[in-house]
From Swiss-Prot:
The protein's name in its UniProt record: Myogenesis-regulating glycosidase
Region entry Disordered, spans: 1-26
Keyword field: Endoplasmic reticulum, Glycoprotein, Glycosidase, Hydrolase, Membrane, Nucleus, Signal-anchor, Transmembrane, Transmembrane helix
Natural source organism: Mus musculus (Mouse)
CDD domains: GH31_NET37 (cd06592)
Length: 716
């Protein structure tokens, strides 16, 4: 185009790189056409909105922002609602008031409610496998977390902890036992013992510590662990650090798990406030047997040794139910003579309460035992090993009391200045402080001297329950958990393990001696009677104690608690025989009331089952005992051990297994010479030679004579 064309419209000049374009450099060409050359970087100017359009545009933008805000708010609100209703961690569903756990099939197997407050789920956050919350629904601060742990493919575990930030509060969670098809086991030896657990009435949470069940109907027994197991393959273990209290409510079928430091013998660890924590681990597996095996291997110690073989093979003979405190030298020698005259073997002969001048002495009462050394020599010549009864008390009239006070060997009152005196079943005295190294050495030193002087084989360690300590006390080493005192007492038996027996157990599974059930009454029922024997043995077995002594055949024969005989003192004849038959299949059996106090038939029945024990039962017991140091599996097992999915097996409390191959079904009711017997799946051969291979099967009214126990061996 010609450069002299006239420009009638404004054109934008082209700036050359490096040039400075000012107003004077602008050149306008004359207009010659309707086209104009535009610069390379030209962009048309945006027309400015008129003043009338601006309010409309602002309104539109504002409306759009409001719509977006509403959408975002609704999404946030919906998410918040979903969050407030439930949080999930693998198979666990957490809500404000508790949580539930499902198994791999989606079935609910565990449910728990928070009873000391609800969670504010808006305060919860997740960090990997850890889900933590910092606030309760009422706004108070707390520390709560659930951590998911998968220790193996078939097991899922959840670590749960609720800790109050302020001292003085109690933390309580309610664990529901579920519907009638769910069954729970474990916990503690009880006065009225059922298998599975049966809740009765309502019980406010009380300290879960070792106790003498004779002191209270609702007391927990001398052997207990913070462990429960469900037939639906769920298990719970409460942590050792918890100031643990347990109650129950039978109406809602719940167990009340509580942690508190007020109105209790629990004390916070040194340097910590009295703000309690409730912490535990819940694990879910594929079946009840496998999850129990996992929990035992994870949380319980195992015995490192096995007691003497004669304790599994031959009966123990005790002076207690026969002679009580009236025992003396002549009675001991006569008892030993009668045992041999009636051709019975013996694991050992036990001289029980009371052979000393006072409780707390460690020498024989010369009035009752004028020549104890000669008595021991004669017993030894007759082939008897001898054990002695001992306990942790030193009565105020004992020759040892002054020494114990001077050397500060006793549990003391809270200020620590004076020994704490307690009342026990044999008077008033002090209690040895087994947290004190000097007290431990003093006690064991006396036992060693007794063993050396008289060739005593071992000892029966009686008592040891926390219920015999004052509620407020102090020890050489402070105890935040009072049951640790019981554990320290059981440790006194370890040097004498081969034939020793103790009656308390708390975290004591590594003590390689027999754990004795609390004394039984000479009655038929579940209240410390014959029917309670199998449930108690199964419970203690599930708590990790395989070497169990079910106390004396026929019970203690205390007159006011005895189903009496018409022809003399002691338990009635039928009860005695049925008790003897059960005991013959237990890890240990113990006589005190002897069979010859009845008649020749009872003596013959006793001989029959002593021989059966030696030939059939004892070899199996010893084989299983040898495996325990590796596996931790119980010797006496419930039927569901080999049939974990069998709902009938879950609730049977009158049969048991020895290992996996010997099933025992004794008669436990008066006047019966038949019983129903349940055989789980498999091939079973009866003691009569019958083969049962169409199983599982219920044998109704299976005949069992007075001199028989129905037992079956695995034939597959």
């Amino acid at each position: 185009m010609s450069q002299n064309l006239q420009e009638t419209s404004q054109a934008y000049p082209r700036h050359r790189p490096g040039s400075h374009a000012g107003p004077k450099s602008l050149k306008v060409t004359p207009r010659a056409t309707m086209y104009t050359f535009l610069p390379d970087n030209f962009s048309p100017a945006k027309p400015k909105p008129t003043k009338e359009l601006r309010p409309l545009l602002c309104s539109a933008v504002l409306g759009l922002l409001l719509v977006l805000a509403a959408v975002v708010a609704w999404c946030y609100y919906s998410a918040s609602l979903r969050k407030a209703e439930r949080l999930r961690a693998e198979l666990l569903d957490l809500n404000r008031g508790g949580f539930s756990i499902r198994n791999q099939k989606g079935e609910q197997v565990f449910r728990l409610a928070f009873r000391s407050g609800a969670l504010d789920l808006d305060s919860c956050s997740r960090d990997g496998a850890l889900l933590g919350c910092s606030r309760a629904a009422d706004g108070r601060p707390l520390h709560f977390f659930i951590q998911t742990v998968r220790p193996k493919d078939t097991v899922m575990c959840y670590r749960v902890r609720w800790e109050e930030a302020v001292p003085g509060r109690a933390v309580e969670h309610a664990m529901f036992l579920g519907d009638a098809a769910a069954h729970w086991y474990g916990g503690a030896e009880m006065r009225t013992q059922h298998w599975p657990i049966r809740l009765d009435g309502q019980q406010e949470p009380q300290p879960f510590v070792t106790s003498d069940v004779y002191s209270s109907d609702a007391a927990f027994g001398g052997i207990l662990e913070r462990y429960w197991l469900s037939s639906r393959a769920a298990a719970i273990k409460v942590n050792d650090s918890v100031p643990f209290h347990l109650g129950w409510n039978s109406t809602e079928r719940s167990m009340r798990l509580q942690a508190r430091y007020h109105d209790t013998s629990y004390k916070p660890p040194a340097g910590r406030t009295a703000a309690p924590e409730l912490s535990y681990r819940v694990c879910v597996g594929s079946d009840v047997t496998s999850i129990h095996k996992y929990m035992v291997r994870r949380y319980f110690n195992k015995p490192s040794r096995v007691p003497a073989s004669e304790a599994f093979r031959d009966p123990i003979w005790s002076t207690w139910a026969l002679h009580g405190r009236a025992v003396d030298q002549n009675k001991v020698l006569q008892f030993a003579q009668q045992i041999r005259q009636h051709r019975f073997n013996s694991s050992h002969l036990e001289i029980d309460d009371m052979y000393t001048p006072a409780y707390g002495d460690f020498n024989f009462d010369e009035g009752k035992f004028p020549n104890a050394s000669d008595m021991f020599r004669r017993l030894r010549d007759a082939g008897f090993r001898v054990t002695l009864w001992v306990h942790p008390f030193v009565n105020y009239n004992s020759s040892s009391f002054g020494e114990g006070v001077e050397r500060e060997l006793f549990v003391r009152e809270p200020t620590g200045r004076l020994p704490a005196l307690v009342r026990w079943w044999n008077g008033i005295g002090a209690v040895l402080d087994f947290t004190h190294p000097e007290a431990r050495e003093w006690f064991q030193g006396h036992l060693r001297r007794l063993r050396l002087r008289y060739n005593v084989t071992s000892f029966k360690f009686d008592a040891g329950e926390v219920s015999y300590l004052p509620r407020d006390f102090s020890t050489y080493r402070p105890l935040s958990d009072p049951s640790v005192w019981s554990r320290r007492y059981t440790e006194m038996a370890e040097p004498f393990f081969s034939l020793a027996e103790v009656r308390v157990g708390y975290q004591s599974q590594n003590i390689s001696c027999f754990f004795r059930l609390v004394d039984r009454d000479s009655v038929w029922g579940y209240d410390l009677g014959l029917r309670s024997l199998i449930p108690a043995v199964l419970t203690v077995s599930m708590l990790g104690y395989p070497f169990i002594l079910p106390d004396m055949i026929g019970g203690n024969a205390v007159p006011e608690r005895t189903a009496g005989r018409q022809d003399g003192p002691g338990p009635e004849r039928e009860l005695y025989v049925r008790w003897l038959e059960v005991a013959a299949f237990m890890p240990a059996m113990q006589f005190s009331i002897p069979p010859w106090q009845y008649d020749a038939e009872v003596v013959a029945i006793a001989h029959k089952f002593a021989a059966l024990r030696a030939s059939l039962v004892a070899p199996l017991l010893l084989e299983l005992a040898g495996e325990i140091t590796d596996t931790g599996d119980p010797i006496v097992r419930p039927l569901w051990w080999i049939a974990p999915g069998d709902e009938t097996a879950h609730r049977i409390d009158s049969q048991f297994l020895i290992g996996d191959t010997l099933l025992v079904a004794p008669v436990l009711e008066p006047g019966k010479q038949e019983r129903d017997v349940y055989l789980p799946a498999g091939k079973w051969r009866s003691y009569k030679g019958e083969l049962f291979d169409k199983t599982p099967v219920l044998l109704t009214d299976y005949p069992v004579d007075l001199d028989e126990v129905a037992y079956f061996t695995w034939a597959s």
